[in-house]
Amino acid sequence: MSKFRSLADIRRDYGELQLSEESAENDPISQFKLWFDDVLLNEKNDPTAMVLSTVDEKGYPDSRVVLLKGLENGNFIFYTNYQSAKAMQIQKNPYAALNFYWPQMARQVRVRGRVKKISSEQSDAYFSSRPLKSQFSAIVSPQSQEILDRISLEDALNQLIEEYGQKPVVRPENWGGYMIIPDEIEFWQGRDNRLHDRIHYYRHGHEWTHRRLAP
């Protein structure tokens, strides 16, 4: 049996959790918070991990895993280098998608919306809360650019450690946060026999409305 044939045979049942129109919250942010509280109790690894998808100038989609670092006023916040590939793509096309997947609970959340930078004050506050070596790494890494080798990065990091010691570090201007302002959010609950639950929220003017989608 080939490896590809065996891959086709990999499957599992998802259990008894469910999501109905009646049990769903009226707005998706309340529903997300409700699910996320459960996730923090049940997911062992990286509960804040989310796939961020953007589109480059050629129209090619691009995805990577980033970490959710805030949910403020209904907006999803993450941080990155403003000169990275994702930042360049966002600059040209300020729309993105997020995908959360929590396998222990067989739950998935998909988000689509507009992207904009958060305030410098917010970025400063988060940057100063990071471990010191993580702050140094943000300074020395020219994210998404070709580098000679890993040793050069480590040497630059060690040099900064010697230079700064325990002194406060100023956030570099090319590093900070983005918020995704959602226009659509879908909640997916895995069910047995592949008859999954899907509740899709979308903006209707200034209000949210939701509907059930077929799996």
Curated annotation (Swiss-Prot):
- PROSITE patterns given in the database record: PYRIDOX_OXIDASE (PS01064)
Its pathway?
Answer: Cofactor metabolism; pyridoxal 5'-phosphate salvage; pyridoxal 5'-phosphate from pyridoxamine 5'-phosphate: step 1/1; Cofactor metabolism; pyridoxal 5'-phosphate salvage; pyridoxal 5'-phosphate from pyridoxine 5'-phosphate: step 1/1
Query: Please, one GO biological process term?
Result: pyridoxine biosynthetic process
Q: Where does FMN bind?
A: 64-69, 79-80, 86, 108, 143-144, 188, 198
Q: Which GO terms describe its molecular function?
A: FMN binding; pyridoxamine phosphate oxidase activity
Q: Name one Pfam family in it.
A: PNP_phzG_C
The answer, when asked if Oxidoreductase is one of the entry's keywords, is yes
Q: Which cofactor does it need?
A: FMN
Q: Tell me the cofactor note.
A: Binds 1 FMN per subunit.
The residues that hold substrate are 11-14, 69, 126, 130, 134, 194-196
Entry annotated with the keyword Membrane: no
User: Reaction catalysed by this chain?
Assistant: pyridoxamine 5'-phosphate + O2 + H2O = pyridoxal 5'-phosphate + H2O2 + NH4(+); pyridoxine 5'-phosphate + O2 = pyridoxal 5'-phosphate + H2O2
| The protein, known as | Pyridoxine/pyridoxamine 5'-phosphate oxidase
According to the lineage, what is the superkingdom? Bacteria
Instruction: Describe the subunit structure.
Output: Homodimer.
Could you say which enzyme class this protein belongs to? oxidoreductase
Give the organism the record lists.
Legionella pneumophila subsp. pneumophila (strain Philadelphia 1 / ATCC 33152 / DSM 7513)
Q: Which family does it belong to?
A: Belongs to the pyridoxamine 5'-phosphate oxidase family.
Per the UniProt record, which EC number(s) apply here?
Answer: 1.4.3.5
- InterPro entries associated with the record: Pyridox_Oxase (IPR000659), Pyridox_Oxase_CS (IPR019740), Pyridox_Oxase_N (IPR011576), Pyridoxamine_oxidase_dimer_C (IPR019576), Split_barrel_FMN-bd (IPR012349)
Keywords, A to Z, come to:
Flavoprotein, FMN, Oxidoreductase, Pyridoxine biosynthesis
Q: What does this protein do?
A: Catalyzes the oxidation of either pyridoxine 5'-phosphate (PNP) or pyridoxamine 5'-phosphate (PMP) into pyridoxal 5'-phosphate (PLP).
